[in-house]
Amino acid sequence: MNRIDEISTKSKEMILSRLKDSYKIAGFESSNSIDPVEHVQTTNNPLEEMKQKMSDNKYIVHECDPSALEDTINEIVASYGYSKMIYGSGLNLNLDKINASSKICFDKPIEELRADVFHREFSIVHAEYGVSSHGVALLKSSQAQPRMLSLAPNLCIVLLKKDRVKNSLASALNALKADQNGKLPSNILFIAGPSRTAD
């Protein structure tokens, strides 16, 4: 073993050893961080604030009853003249009611669907939560709802239940963490409007 390999091996072992030891802090107790939204000017109506701030972020917000969801989606898609849809396996909508000449489920690796993904005109995704203080939708990227669904098509329809609006990023993340048995997912998207996605 040459000197460089020897130093690299020692460094690697030292770093890994420190990482293992860092998780064993005696007496450490996790606590929720202070919510910085206290410093943001908000209203007493998170839903209305959410809709206003989403509109400010260039979302086109539509409100509808669950019974009219597919009809509302069809109206939106028709207004753009789109007919090629891509969706995740976890969509949980009646796809027979969605007017699209072509519907592709994103349930395979991107390498197998690359040509289809980038030639789809619209997608439909579920948001886990909305954040009223920022007007953003929080999505959990997963195999059932790949991140690419919100990026590749020209139009991404984000479905958000009214009772899933939180007043801050911290409260939305804490709620998602509670939903996930105390652990956050490895990939979370905050969508703030067209071409404004952060993970």
Feature-to-residue mapping (PLM):
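The feature marks the mature, well-folded catalytic cores of soluble enzymes
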Residues: 1-199
